[in-house]
């Protein structure tokens, strides 16, 4: 999924959650209750709304009593279940105010909780009575005495209590400041460690992708939080219509099945599957676009079939043990860029039922020789004379960067050669780093200036109607384009010649979502980065 916002808005239906939730209802009865409450209130009495309906109350205690009796939401149980103290409680209240989740969702949450972000310290409602509630009373209930010790008046006792609370608040703020400072030191240490470490360990059964921490992987997921990349992907007709045709033309694969959509984005594949007759569809995505996806699902009245879960597939807890079908649009530039296939294979190993299927199921990567002397000169020879100055040293920075662009088919000078065949049902994560010898049959005498790579996608297993699409330069262009590896020193080739070479593909050791590609060709070796 070469797509890369924040979709979290303070409206009903945008919930940072692990499930797609039905929208709360504002019934006429609730409005009537609110009117009755307003009529009975003294003028100027401060009110606060219920967390789950429109009723108003004049104290936190009344509000929580109502939540417990009418909505089966017990704040005492919630605080103890998650070990919430002052700041955790504040975040919880603001999270509910901002995201409007259902009671069922709130009662189903387990750690990690979705209200940990600093943004939930900001009050949603001005003068919210619930934020003035002392959550520590839930841990240490105290009885209010009817007489005051040592001859203190009631006012004096209140003042002393306020001083005690102020001191406790200052202590908590100081502790939070120290915690933030420690956290920053830890982050800096982790960044320094990553930048100075060349090797990540990886076994054949696990992926370094699964081990990435939030601060390491945040840029990747945040890039998918903006609508723009999803618009680009949805408008890619080759991509989107291929998935649609595969699903709609093979409904037997989805009828009454439980389907998992890994990296669901806006939910388009989940909705295709639901329309094809799936019994249940689970969409998982870590990016903020999931909040818009929740609204999209409700707008299309598919919330009874589709459940959306926010988080990494390696970390979330699905509401089912096994699924029948896994679908995902995981492909990146040169197929493997972004390493999202690692996550799909993780999901397959953990959740796919025996006899289940993963789609797309077959993928191939191919190379082809390119001759485009003008473009090579524009990007490489350009540095030999820049306004009369020599800048040839810049070539060392330009050449190692793979270029993603749409090639003119007329620049192709060889037949393609496959270098990798992936069957998603049998491939392991370790197979995604590989070396391959290749031979390119030259079709036209010319100068070879670059080698280009692209991939083809197949929906085949159990399909009555097979669907295939290509990202090659001779096919309709897609948002994946082609990946071009410019040669430092072009060389001549003759028609009919067999140009032999070797390619090695690895994850970047410092950024495993990026790729390192090494080409050996014409007695020369060059390493390229795709990032």
Swiss-Prot record:
The keyword Hydrolase does not apply. Changing residue 468 to A: Loss of interaction with ALDH1A1. Residues 48-71 are annotated as: Interaction with ZNF200. S-adenosyl-L-homocysteine binds at residues 239, 263, 285, 313-314, 343. Keywords: Acetylation, Cytoplasm, Metal-binding, Methyltransferase, Nucleus, Phosphoprotein, S-adenosyl-L-methionine, Transferase, Zinc, Zinc-finger. The modification Phosphoserine is found at residues 25, 27, 171. GO terms for cellular component: cytoplasm; cytosol; nucleus. One of its GO terms (molecular function) is histone H4R3 methyltransferase activity. The keyword Chaperone does not apply. Residues 16-39 have a biased composition (Acidic residues). SUPFAM superfamilies: beta-beta-alpha zinc fingers, S-adenosyl-L-methionine-dependent methyltransferases. Transmembrane segments: none annotated. InterPro entries: ANM3-like_C2H2_Zf, ANM3_Znf-C2H2, Arg_MeTrfase, PRMT_dom, SAM-dependent_MTases_sf, Znf_C2H2_sf, Znf_C2H2_type. One of its GO terms (biological process) is chromatin remodeling. It comes from the Eukaryota. Residues 217-531 form the SAM-dependent MTase PRMT-type domain. This is Protein arginine N-methyltransferase 3. The lineage of its organism: Eukaryota, Metazoa, Chordata, Craniata, Vertebrata.
């Amino acid at each position: 999924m070469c797509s890369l916002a924040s979709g979290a808005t303070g409206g009903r239906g945008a919930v940072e959650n692990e499930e797609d939730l039905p929208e709360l209802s504002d019934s006429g009865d609730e409005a009537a209750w609110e009117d009755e409450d307003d009529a009975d209130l003294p003028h100027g009495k401060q009110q606060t709304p219920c967390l789950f309906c429109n009723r108003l109350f004049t104290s936190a205690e009344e509000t929580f009593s109502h939540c417990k009796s009418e909505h089966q939401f017990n704040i005492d149980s919630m605080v103890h279940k998650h070990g919430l103290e002052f700041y955790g409680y504040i975040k919880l209240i603001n999270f509910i105010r901002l995201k409007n989740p259902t009671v069922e969702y709130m009662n189903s949450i387990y750690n990690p909780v979705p209200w940990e972000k600093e943004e939930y310290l900001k009050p949603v409602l001005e003068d919210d009575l619930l934020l003035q509630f002392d959550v520590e009373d839930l841990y240490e209930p105290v009885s209010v005495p009817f007489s005051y010790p040592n001859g203190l008046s009631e006012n004096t006792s209140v003042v002393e209590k306020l001083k005690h609370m102020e001191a406790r608040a200052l202590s908590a703020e100081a502790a939070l400041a120290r915690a933030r400072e420690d956290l920053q030191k830890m982050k800096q240490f982790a960044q320094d460690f990553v930048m100075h470490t060349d090797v990540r360990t990886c076994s054949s059964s696990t992926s370094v992708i699964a081990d990435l921490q939030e601060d390491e992987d945040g840029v990747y997921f945040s890039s998918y939080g903006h609508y723009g990349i999803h618009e680009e992907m949805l408008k890619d007709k080759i991509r989107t219509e291929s998935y649609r045709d595969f699903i709609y033309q093979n409904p037997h694969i989805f009828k009454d099945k439980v389907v998992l959509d890994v990296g669901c984005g806006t939910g388009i594949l989940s909705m295709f599957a639901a329309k094809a007759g799936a019994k249940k569809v689970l969409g998982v995505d870590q990016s903020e676009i999931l909040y818009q996806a929740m609204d999209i699902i409700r707008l299309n009245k598919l919330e009874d079939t589709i459940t959306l879960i926010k988080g990494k597939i390696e970390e979330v807890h699905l509401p089912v043990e096994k699924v029948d079908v896994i679908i995902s649009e995981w492909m990146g530039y040169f197929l493997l860029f972004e390493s999202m296939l690692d996550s799909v294979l993780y999901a397959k190993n953990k959740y796919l039922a025996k006899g289940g299927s993963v789609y797309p199921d077959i993928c191939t990567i191919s190379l082809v020789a390119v001759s485009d002397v003008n473009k090579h000169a524009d990007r490489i020879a350009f540095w030999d004379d820049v306004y009369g100055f020599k800048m040839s040293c810049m070539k060392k920075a330009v050449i190692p960067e793979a270029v993603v662009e749409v090639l003119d088919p007329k620049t192709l000078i060889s037949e393609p050669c496959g270098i990798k065949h992936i069957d998603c049902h049998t491939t392991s994560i370790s197979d995604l780093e590989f070396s391959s010898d290749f031979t390119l049959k030259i079709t036209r005498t010319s100068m070879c200036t670059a080698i280009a790579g692209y991939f083809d996608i197949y929906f085949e297993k159990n399909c009555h109607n097979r669907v295939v699409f290509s990202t090659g330069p001779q096919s309709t262009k897609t948002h994946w384009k082609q990946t071009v590896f410019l040669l430092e020193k072009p060389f001549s080739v003759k028609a009919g010649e067999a140009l032999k070479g070797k390619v090695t593909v690895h994850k970047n050791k410092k950024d495993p979502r990026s790729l390192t590609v090494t080409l050996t060709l014409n007695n020369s070796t060059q390493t390229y980065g795709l990032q």
